[in-house]
Amino acid sequence: MKMPLNIGLIHFVGIGGIGMSGIAEVFHNLGYKVQGSDQIDNANVKRLQDKGIQVHVGHHAENLGDAEFVVLSTAIKKTNPEYIAAKERHLPLVKRAEMLAELMRFRRAIAVGGTHGKTTTTSMIAALLDAGSFDPMVINGGIINAYGTNARMGEGDWMVVEADESDGTFLKLPADIAVVTNIDREHLDHYGSFAAVRDAFRQFVENVPFYGFAVLCIDHPEVQSLASRIDDRWVITYGANPQADIRFLNLSMDGQKTYFDVFMRSRKTGRETELKNLVLPMSGQHNVSNATAAIAIAHELGISNESIKKGLAGFGGVKRRFTQIGSWRGVEIFDDYGHHPVEIKAVLCAARESAKGRVIAIAQPHRYSRLYHLFDDFAACFNDADIVLIAPVYAAGEEPITGFGARELVEHIQMAGHRDVRLIDCLEDVVSIVSTFSKSGDYVVFLGAGNITQWACALPNQLAVFDNNDKFSAD
């Protein structure tokens, strides 16, 4: 049965989160009564309020009001006063993925999974479907620059969603097409073991109906291994791997643009197709890989080669995905969400390939549990940065773990052989180091899923203030 409109008020706890805000926005646009609360008055909260959605800042039992249903972010604990109040009133408690599944139930759906690259790949698929006049609904884990939001209504039959594997609820999503970009050691605090992560992604693919298909990146050993174990579903492989069904090759980069070709070979018919001289307005092989997943789906859905080329060339990117936010004396400043060693390594590799000068990385570790599980990987992921600045850990509600903090990470990176890694405490430290050591042509790259983005956005103005003060002193 389709979810009726007259179900009453839906209350979202943690509505300011990137995933929750998109779902709440779409339900509001569909005509449902929506409200919510969040601990922080952030940009997502303001966007929802501007659309007429009531959002309380802070979590309190009385925020529920006349709510009939309560939707919970994965970050909400059982000690949350709104959770407790909902339990006392015997209100249905709904997980974020369940609400997303309701939206997907009556459209043909593409779900993008993987431990990294989901947000960009989701955005690229949406862009190519848009270029092919599919007019898709989109719910993403990041702000799509072309839309100015992470949610898009769309009137077409297709829907594109980011499938968050962090708590296992992505297995609830009824997808016709499933994408797996990669599988790495992540969210072990939930899964308990990497074997459990592998099993979850296998189930994600096997949940695809017999008339659907999976799109798997076989450049990643774990995903190639997964592909070999899927024998009852249609699988399309992609990557730089010569054995991939959809293969990208002949890469060249010019600043923030990447040029490449794609060779496509159908397992069903044996037909071979080439797409040459593709232009992606982003740097980095990892972004070309993400684009190739989108091309694979667009091609399979019958979107013309010309529309694919046009959609790719016009792709506007995603907020906080190697986003240039300013410059100072020829030094380019970027902000990126990367917080896992694999993501950090890919971003810094892209920066190294496109920068004319050096790369200065400012990283804010996200969660003590992630540092604990991936400590050695973090020590080895900064090789493409000439200078590494490590900020205090963004705890995200976790308690510190002895021996796994920012200072210990700096020491571990040094022991792994990096020649210039430093501990910093605040934005003023960044201003001092960048103003002293950077030169025209250098890239400054902020990395992290916490509030490091605020430092990134503030740095250009802080450097301008430094210039003014320097000029004043000289006068």
Curated annotation (Swiss-Prot):
Its main location: cytoplasm. InterPro entries: Mur-like_cat_sf (IPR036565), Mur_ligase_C (IPR004101), Mur_ligase_C_dom_sf (IPR036615), Mur_ligase_cen (IPR013221), Mur_ligase_N (IPR000713), MurCDEF_pg_biosynth (IPR050061), UDP-N-AcMur_Ala_ligase_MurC (IPR005758). One of its GO terms (biological process) is peptidoglycan biosynthetic process. It is an enzyme of class 6 (ligase). The keyword Cell wall biogenesis/degradation applies. One of its GO terms (cellular component) is cytoplasm. It catalyses: UDP-N-acetyl-alpha-D-muramate + L-alanine + ATP = UDP-N-acetyl-alpha-D-muramoyl-L-alanine + ADP + phosphate + H(+). Pathway: Cell wall biogenesis; peptidoglycan biosynthesis. Keywords: ATP-binding, Cell cycle, Cell division, Cell shape, Cell wall biogenesis/degradation, Cytoplasm, Ligase, Nucleotide-binding, Peptidoglycan synthesis. Its EC number is 6.3.2.8. It is found in: Cytoplasm. GO terms for molecular function: ATP binding; UDP-N-acetylmuramate-L-alanine ligase activity. ATP binds at G114, T115, H116, G117, K118, T119, T120. NCBIfam families: murC. Belongs to the MurCDEF family. HAMAP family: MurC (MF_00046). Cell wall formation. This is UDP-N-acetylmuramate--L-alanine ligase. It comes from Bartonella henselae (strain ATCC 49882 / DSM 28221 / CCUG 30454 / Houston 1). The lineage of its organism: Bacteria, Pseudomonadati, Pseudomonadota, Alphaproteobacteria, Hyphomicrobiales.
